[in-house]
């Protein structure tokens, strides 16, 4: 199963490869996608699954128990979005790349160790060199003392201990919002971890 919701939000020459396009995977893969991220319509909850006939029967059974269908106007809106001109995608990626580059520079300036993302709209950082017990303590400090919300990195690991030194920032905001966050982050003076 592959979640391909960020297929159009790529940077620095990164290429999207659909898992089902790989030889031998077409009948084994379930591709999940939606209009949420690419079209900034997260509240609509319109998505889809693409799979072989042998898998779709089971998907439909599970779907029937978990949700009802999306409202018709939302389905029509999704169709209009999906039929929109292709120049939308490069423009979207360029706008997010600008935000990524801006936030990355600020985070590095402040002292975060940044993992350079080539897709999506998040930046994972390492804070293991800072004087925090773990990612949760750092995230609470940032929101309570600095006024910038992050997500503890351990949330994204099947073995949470592997993410205890990481926090994730998101940049799908207006530039003015990111500039305000940058001003707050520049007041952050992290202590270095002792020993």
Regions found by a protein language model. Give the residues of each.
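PLP-dependent class I/II
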Residues: 1-195
């Amino acid at each position: 199963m592959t979640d391909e919701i960020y297929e159009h939000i790529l940077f620095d020459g990164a290429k999207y490869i659909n898992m089902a396009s790989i030889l031998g995977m077409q009948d084994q893969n379930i591709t999940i996608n939606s209009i949420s991220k690419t079209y900034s319509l997260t509240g609509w909850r319109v998505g889809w699954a693409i799979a072989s006939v042998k898998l779709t029967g089971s998907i439909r059974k599970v779907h029937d128990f978990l949700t009802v269908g999306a409202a018709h106007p939302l389905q029509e809106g999704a169709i209009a979005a999906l039929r929109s001109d292709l120049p939308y995608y490069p423009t979207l990626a360029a706008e997010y790349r600008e935000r990524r580059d801006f936030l990355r520079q600020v985070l590095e300036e402040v002292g975060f160790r940044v993992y350079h993302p080539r897709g999506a709209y998040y930046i994972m950082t390492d804070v293991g060199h800072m004087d925090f017990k773990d990612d949760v303590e750092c995230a609470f400090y940032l929101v309570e003392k600095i006024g910038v919300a992050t997500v503890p990195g351990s949330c994204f690991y099947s073995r949470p201990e592997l993410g205890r030194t990481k926090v994730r920032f998101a940049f799908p905001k207006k530039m003015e919002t990111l500039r305000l966050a940058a001003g707050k982050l520049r007041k952050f003076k992290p202590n270095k971890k002792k020993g």
